[in-house]
Amino acid sequence: MQNINEIEELIKLISKLPGLGPKSAKRIVLKLINNRDELVKPMANTLAQVYKNVIRCQSCGTLKSNSLGCNNCENSKEKYNKICVVEDIADQWSIENSNIYKGYFHILGGTISSAGQRKEDLLINSLVERVSRENIEEVILATSATVEGQTTAYYIEDSLKKTSTKVTKLAQGLPVGGEIESLDDGTLYSAFKNRTGIKTNSD
């Protein structure tokens, strides 16, 4: 293939996306080039709008329009007494699509890890503030069954010790190393239904 700088750069960028390597990236780039008017123009416009207008809510971590309030927390149409804590937005979407949980979400933005992700980088302090401010009765820890996910869950539990809120975690049985977004609806349903208490509001 003749080296064209713009194409090579696009292949490099696309190959950075989750689950995509150089071969898959090349196929995607060829598809885009062969469908410029149908795909490239509208995609470029949409990406520009997303870059300009979509941000993370500083309180709960979900995505929101920078010109509107957050529908997950401040402008929610429903009032709940539960918060489900997840690592990232993909986990929130998976749980929402399964229709097994009705309540607020709190997106941490990652996990505490040895790779340099610190607890200060995550939205843990804002979670504690939400729990107190919104009179939350239960916090459900839905972090992944990885060392990093469990370490993060333990830290959150410790951070909530001074509150009267019940803290639960998804039931055991999640595959070790499994990430929430990769679980099927049946596994998620069982994990939520059989969740176990870590800290009760009588502690």
Swiss-Prot record:
GO terms for biological process: DNA recombination; DNA repair. Keywords: DNA damage, DNA recombination, DNA repair, Metal-binding, Zinc, Zinc-finger. It comes from the Bacteria. Signal peptide: none annotated. A zinc finger (C4-type) spans 57-73. InterPro entries: DNA_Rcmb_RecR, Rcmb_RecR, TOPRIM_dom, TOPRIM_RecR. Residues 81-175 form the Toprim domain. PROSITE patterns: TOPRIM. CDD domains: TOPRIM_recR. GO terms for molecular function: DNA binding; zinc ion binding. NCBIfam families: recR. Belongs to the RecR family. May play a role in DNA repair. It seems to be involved in an RecBC-independent recombinational process of DNA repair. It may act with RecF and RecO. This is Recombination protein RecR. It comes from Pelagibacter ubique (strain HTCC1062).
